[in-house]
């Protein structure tokens, strides 16, 4: 993590050149996931499997039933990248003296504040949100964070994305949901992208164990290119050599960009904007999201980002520019949606990897901290207000950070339960089987599932590992002829596991024995065709 976040450095008012260099180096670190996402090549939806060109087809019956049990609500996650300073966003005027004492230089003057109620205010340059609040379309959850706050940008971002704060979990909370919803996603992807992500390079929020479930572009320009032209990169002219195989692998495992290009294009061109978004970065992203929503794309989750919240120095000017962009963009976004009567169907939610320290540093800024507010927007909130207790700005933890009063996973749990009306068992999977509170956000689930799951195809399949042998175990609900084919990750056919009549009941197949030849160690994909449906999953040969 950044050196200046260590307790040994927390009292220094100025950072040394070496310390700042370490901080800058951390921001320049890229991993393989970041590199691929920066190219706009993200996702795992479409690939060549042998002679089969996999394209957008209808989801499995179970996926359809699960999808139909949901409502028509949409979530737009707005990531404030870098760690937003909550005290200068939602100002605690109930204890203005303490606030001003901690921040003699960067504080907001009382004359420059717009009161939301008697206790809390926003800076006057966020005045675009004054009407949003007044119309009952804004909630603020106080003091959001988690225990033993990690002060590294990258680790804390992963914690917010994965929900795991005590170990490194490789999947994201939305990735786990979509992995459960689309178990055969590799070969039978849904007709619409499960999620759309602009920027946030390297974020694992939509990562499953084997796929990224978001249509992801590195920036707005790439999204506009796809939306307006229907294409992004060439996937046909790939050389027939080792390099070509590697290039094909990277593009094949990231081909949702191409898979959904036409769908994105159709939705984008079917609608137009009916609000002035200005020239801000976030505003332009949200204007594109609004067109996709109004154009009937059908995607349930979007994520956009606004960067540069890491305000170690010269915070007043930088923070003002960012919060103005946020405020103006939110107002325009919901004005735009209201024209189509969709402002009550879309919930906006800000997240940030951490807050800032309660006191200013010696560079007209603030250093990495802990608790910070989460803001929610939309007519579906049924009134504006504050949720939970505000942290005591005079009571800090051992690292001089505000003590969180609400867990960020409580916010997630509340949205999943009362906005998307998901079944508790599904939410348990999403939140790694941990229990969290449900906050009073003003939203209440009004949708009950009316689907009869007794008629859903109960076919199941799973690889089982026993004594250095890999078995494919299946439960077949009704007899039928089926084929099972094994592929490597590039999509080359390795061999046929089975081509036979499967009787009703349980089946266990020894993969190595069925293939009849030596298999190299590594990951493979099997594809089952049975009863007019296709299923796939990865397995490991050890």
Task: Please name every model-derived segment.
Residues 119-227:
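Extracytoplasmic mature domains of secreted/periplasmic and thylakoid-lumen proteins
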Residues 501-504, 512-513, 517-542:
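C-terminal tail/sorting-segment detector
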Residues 5-7, 92-98, 107-127, 311-447:
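Feature marks hydrolase-like catalytic cores characterized by long aromatic- and Gly/Pro-rich stretches
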Residues 49-87, 95, 455, 493:
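C-terminal segment of N-terminal export signals and the immediately downstream linker at the start
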Residues 443-469, 475-477:
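Residue-level detector of functionally pivotal "anchor" positions at catalytic/ligand-binding pockets or at interdomain
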Residues 238-332, 336:
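Anion-binding catalytic surfaces of enzymes that hydrolyze or transfer phosphate/sulfate esters
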Residues 28, 34-59:
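N-terminal export signals
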Residues 1-30, 477, 515:
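N-terminal secretory signal peptides
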């Amino acid at each position: 993590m950044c050196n200046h976040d260590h307790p040994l450095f927390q009292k220094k008012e100025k950072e040394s050149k070496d310390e700042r260099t370490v901080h800058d180096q951390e921001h320049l670190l890229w991993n393989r996931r970041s590199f691929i996402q920066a190219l706009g090549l993200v996702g795992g939806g479409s690939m060549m499997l042998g002679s089969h060109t996999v394209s957008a087809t209808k989801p499995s019956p179970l996926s359809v039933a699960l999808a139909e049990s949901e409502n028509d609500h949409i979530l737009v996650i707005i990531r404030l990248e870098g760690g937003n300073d909550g005290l200068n966003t939602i100002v605690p005027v109930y204890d203005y003296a303490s606030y001003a004492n901690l921040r003699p230089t960067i504080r907001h003057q009382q004359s420059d504040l717009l009161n939301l109620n008697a206790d809390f205010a926003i800076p006057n340059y966020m005045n675009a949100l004054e009407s949003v609040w007044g119309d009952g379309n804004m909630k603020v959850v106080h003091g959001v964070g988690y225990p033993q706050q990690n002060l590294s940008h990258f680790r804390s971002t992963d914690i917010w994305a994965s929900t795991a704060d005590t170990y490194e979990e490789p999947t994201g909370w939305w990735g786990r949901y979509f992995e459960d919803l689309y178990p055969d996603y590799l070969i039978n992807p849904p007709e619409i992208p499960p999620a759309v992500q602009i920027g946030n390079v390297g974020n694992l929020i939509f990562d499953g164990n084997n796929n990224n479930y978001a249509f992801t572009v590195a920036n707005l320009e790439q999204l506009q290119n796809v939306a307006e032209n229907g294409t992004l990169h060439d996937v046909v002219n790939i050389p027939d050599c080792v390099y070509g195989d590697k290039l094909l692998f990277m593009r094949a495992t990231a081909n949702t960009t191409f898979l959904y290009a036409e769908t994105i294009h159709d939705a984008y061109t079917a609608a137009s904007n009916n609000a002035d978004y200005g020239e801000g970065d976030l505003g332009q992203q949200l204007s594109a999201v609004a067109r996709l929503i109004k154009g009937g794309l059908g995607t349930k989750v979007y994520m956009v980002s606004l960067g540069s919240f890491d305000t170690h120095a010269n915070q007043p000017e930088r923070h003002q520019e960012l919060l103005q962009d946020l405020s103006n963009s939110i107002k325009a976004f919901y004005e735009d949606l209201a024209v189509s009567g969709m402002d009550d169907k879309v919930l906006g939610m800000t997240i940030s990897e951490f807050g800032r320290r309660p006191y200013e540093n010696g560079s007209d800024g603030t250093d990495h901290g802990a608790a910070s507010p989460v803001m929610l927007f939309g007519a579906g909130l049924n009134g504006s207000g504050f949720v939970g207790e505000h942290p005591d700005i005079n009571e800090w933890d051992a690292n001089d950070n505000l003590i969180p009063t609400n867990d960020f996973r409580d916010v997630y749990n509340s949205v999943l339960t009362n906005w998307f009306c998901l079944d508790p068992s599904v939410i348990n999977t999403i939140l790694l089987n941990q229990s969290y509170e449900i906050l009073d956000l003003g939203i209440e689930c009004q949708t009950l599932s009316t689907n009869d799951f007794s008629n859903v195809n109960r076919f199941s399949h799973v690889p089982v590992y026993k004594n250095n042998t890999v078995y494919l175990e299946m439960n077949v609900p009704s007899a039928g002829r089926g084929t099972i084919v094994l592929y490597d990750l590039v999509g080359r056919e390795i061999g046929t596991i089975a081509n036979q009549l499967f009787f009703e009941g349980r089946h266990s197949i020894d993969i190595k024995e069925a293939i009849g030849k030596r298999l190299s160690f590594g990951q493979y994909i099997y594809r089952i065709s049975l009863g007019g449906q296709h299923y796939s999953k990865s397995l490991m040969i050890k």
